[in-house]
Amino acid sequence: MALHAAVKGKLISVIGDEDTCVGFLLGGIGEINKNRHPNFMVVDKNTPVSEIEECFKRFVKRDDIDIILINQNVAELVRHVIDAHTAPVPSVLEIPSKDHPYDASKDSILRRAKGMFNPEDLVR
């Protein structure tokens, strides 16, 4: 009889407004780790910037998270912390919210990724 070890996948985390978080939670991404820490944070107009920064830093340090989704308007509040994160994992993706459309010109991660490729290499 062979024993099979169950391999658990990595998580997606979300930092965003209530609608964004609820949407992703309904999609099944909600998890609480062994220390009872969730993989999401709901941000509203009363959330202190320091709390958002600490949450982002916690998500970056967690070894069970591979992707951090963050509303772009929230990312603007903690841009210096996001820009300081240079490791490929967890990947940080800025997403639109219901009230704030995505603006590629504000996405520093996208600009950094574009700088990694030579446009001439993509044509071939």
Curated annotation (Swiss-Prot):
The lineage of its organism: Eukaryota, Metazoa, Ecdysozoa, Arthropoda, Hexapoda. Keywords: Hydrogen ion transport, Ion transport, Transport. Pfam families: ATP-synt_F (PF01990). GO terms for molecular function: proton-transporting ATPase activity, rotational mechanism. Belongs to the V-ATPase F subunit family. InterPro entries: ATPase_V1-cplx_f_g_su, ATPase_V1-cplx_fsu_euk, ATPase_V1_fsu_sf. One of its GO terms (cellular component) is proton-transporting V-type ATPase, V1 domain. V-ATPase is a heteromultimeric enzyme made up of two complexes: the ATP-hydrolytic V1 complex and the proton translocation V0 complex. The V1 complex consists of three catalytic AB heterodimers that form a heterohexamer, three peripheral stalks each consisting of EG heterodimers, one central rotor including subunits D and F, and the regulatory subunits C and H. The proton translocation complex V0 consists of the proton transport subunit a, a ring of proteolipid subunits c9c'', rotary subunit d, subunits e and f, and the accessory subunits VhaAC45 and ATP6AP2. Subunit of the V1 complex of vacuolar(H+)-ATPase (V-ATPase), a multisubunit enzyme composed of a peripheral complex (V1) that hydrolyzes ATP and a membrane integral complex (V0) that translocates protons. V-ATPase is responsible for acidifying and maintaining the pH of intracellular compartments and in some cell types, is targeted to the plasma membrane, where it is responsible for acidifying the extracellular environment. This is V-type proton ATPase subunit F.
